[in-house]
Amino acid sequence: MKSNNVVFARIFAVSWLVLFCEIMVVRWLGMEVRVLKAFPNLIVIIALVSTSAGLLVPSGKEGGNKRDLVQGLIAFLVLISSVLFSGPLHLADSSIKADHPAPEVALSAVALLMLSACLYVLFKILGKLLAAEFDKLKPIVAYSSNLLGSIAGALSFMIISELCVPPYIWLALVGAVLWFLYKKSYVIAVTVVCVAMSAFVYSGAYFTPYSKITVKPAPAEILAVNDQNSFALYSNNLYFNGGLNVDKVDHINEIQNDSVEVKGMKAYFGVLRVPIMFQPMHDDVLILGSGPGNDVAYALKGGAKHVDAVEIDPVIVKVGKEKHPNNPLTDPRTTVFTEDARSFLRYSKKLYDLVEFAYLDPGNTIDSASLVRVDNFVYTVESIKSVLNHLKPNGVATLIFTTPSVDSFIYQRLYKTVEAACGKPPIAYTARGGVTIVIMFGPGAHPASPDIMASADLVSYPPPGMVLNEPAMTDDWPFLYLALNPLGLITYALLLFVSVVVPVLLMVFSKADVKISKPDWGVMFFLGLGFMLMETKSITQLSLLYGATWLVSSVVILFVLVFAFMANMLASTRNFKSIGWIYLGLVLSLAFGYFWQMPTAGAEHPWLLAFVTSAIACLPVFFGSFIFSICFKNATSNIAYLSANLIGVAIGGLTENICMFSGIKSLAILALFIYGLAYVCWKIGQKNKPLVDVEKASVSS
């Protein structure tokens, strides 16, 4: 019989493993398997549902544990091999777009199903391992260990992400915890193989907090006419930028090569000089999304006295400082800020002659958009207004964006957003045959002269007769890339049915003795659903303050778990006969969060604003977790209650996508309704309990 301390430690370790692996596969698969960007929350939902399924099927015998371990290691090897060799397997460029060849779409669908199956096997085994230990402790103690392990998992990945640690370290940590749980030599063997493969495959890559960055020499044709130090940057296996000598960049137009890199450099560098052409008086320049420094080099070449370069990715800044032929980021006239563009605008007080929206999407999200819910708070009405507040009396702002088509819905959204922020139509052009849009606004913006239009190959936008039907983007609806592709919807629905709906139905209607009443199951389910909705809303609120970064998401997850742990500790101190007053606090905190408006400028002290915003965002989570802990304290079956809650969290991960249609603030209203259903289930359960107690008493007598 294991001591309580050993059981507590094992629950902690499994909980660490579940959350760490969940975050790890979300980030890693998103980098390597391109099509997964089109399916928001799919990995998280599969992980939660499979863990919940495992909780209801605890492994009893030691042989069963061995079989689980072998099956899990096989699934782990398949998953890791698919990720590491996504290039040769053509998973890196997979797509489910209707205009792609049918074999490619079929391959993508098969790959998604295979990866989903591997994830299901892995997380179900972790759920079984957790179930084997969970019922050995009192509910409140077991849940405390679960929360502490989850907190440690979130904190661990947050730290290694910020330190730009490569994946072989991730795998080594996972292998070490698995060995602690199983004490089997083949766990070490499989870990060593996976670590070695990862170290070999990623030997030349940088893992930033946001993406995988690879630096290669520019194509030979570029090197021949530009500079021998010119380079190409790849983000998540796709070319997205490069560093060229801007004094010789005109020569690349003579190259006939149609490679992705050459075409991309022609389109990108062809419009870089446009902002300077539109604002000849540009002593002070701000560049949002400065990348490796090309925009900065053009601004300095054009006579800028000082340039503030804002770039969120520290690795891209490092590459620019070390490798760019013009050395713009190390020029004494340049100040580099490694932070989110929206966060910089909030706290900066400086005014500029020229503000440039440069490359702000190094992940090439738009190239894989199908059913995409990507929050982008830089291209919103509120953000554009913030830029206007940073312009001098004759200042100009330019927004340059590249998409595959002149009639792209993205062009329309960007145009309508700037129009809504300025109160009048902006000056807009398309360039390079329609693949790039240039939007100018601000008090000093004026239409281009015919000479400038001819020199930069500009055409007025929108074309005559074109109707712009797309909505403007706001902080409540910041979905620049959202495109409801019918094929993507069908594929997503099929994946959800196979990976989520079927397992949930099997769990709900199984005849296993789960020792939980229907009202209690409903309480746990709806509390989990509401929890996920409020976690999503919290991430969004804090993204407006600090930027939509991995660090923000990790910090929110960490704080949510800490709040849940605090609520759990409070629930363990005494017996609460009624939770009505806690529901009242939950309702009030939801209402306050809905009506509270974050200040648009950084007049308040950053730490004070951070504390207030975090408290308002996470307070509903505290009350919801408090209710959960009180109910869980009296659970008749730890694993049954936790399983129901995880199913609710998983379905919440799907339900949160309603905000694509109704806005992010609507999640608070939806959460209020969901928590109301939890309260109704609790009241029904309270009415039924006296009847159950009477029946038990009569049987015993």
Residue ranges and their predicted role:
Residues 1-701:
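Alpha-helical transmembrane segments of multi-pass membrane proteins
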